[in-house]
Amino acid sequence: MDYGAILGKGAEADIYSFTAFGTEMVVKVRNPKAYRIAQIDNSIRRARTKKEARIMAHAAGIGVRVPRVFALGTFSIYMEMVKGKNANLLEEKELASRRVLGSAGEMLGMMHSSGIVHGDITPANIMVSGNGIYIIDFGLAEMSRSVEDMGVDLLLMERSVSKNGFGLFLEGYKGRNASSGNVLKRLEEIKRRGRYQNRSLD
């Protein structure tokens, strides 16, 4: 099927622009893996596509801004095209602000409070539009109450932004997640384990 112009290629999926009934959309298509048996590969891709759309709908239902899902194919998700700028392209002054990282922290706090772990929460998966920020790419997201998984989400963001930016992110996060103290404790444990492992490899 011709999905239109390609916007990006990833390890798991490709992203295309698509227009239907006068509406601009983004189509995320999960690619087959040649190393897997076709029947197994189809089953995995079908399940992951459904799960991603389901988690996006759950996030939207609790007030997190995510691209609206218009339709679901066997291996594809047709969703709203968010007009704006990827946060990964912003200058530090604009990125490290309450409007961007502060709001992103609030949204992740809401997600964690509702049992959603993003799995790849970095500025590259934040879109900044005229009416606020959007969290995108739920391809690695899980429904999980694991404090470890939530701590890893925070670690990913901490490693991706400045100290000041992460501080603003945490302000927003703590304001929306009543269990943030437990997650922050686990974050410190994860970091200590990482330092120990690094020393062991030296």
What is each residue range found by the language model?
Residues F21, L72-T74, S129-G130:
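Structural motif
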Residues K28, E52, D120, D137, ...:
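Acidic active-site catalytic centers that drive phospho-/nucleotidyl reactions
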Residues N31, R45-T49, A53, A60, ...:
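Conserved structural core of kinase catalytic domains
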Residues Y3-K50:
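ATP-binding glycine-rich loop module of kinase domains
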Residues H58-V64, N88-A124, S129, I133, ...:
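Conserved kinase catalytic-core helix
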Residues K33-I40, K85-N88, D137-G139, L154:
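Short glycine/proline- and charge-enriched loop/turn segments
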Residues Y134-D202:
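C-lobe/activation-segment region of protein kinase-like
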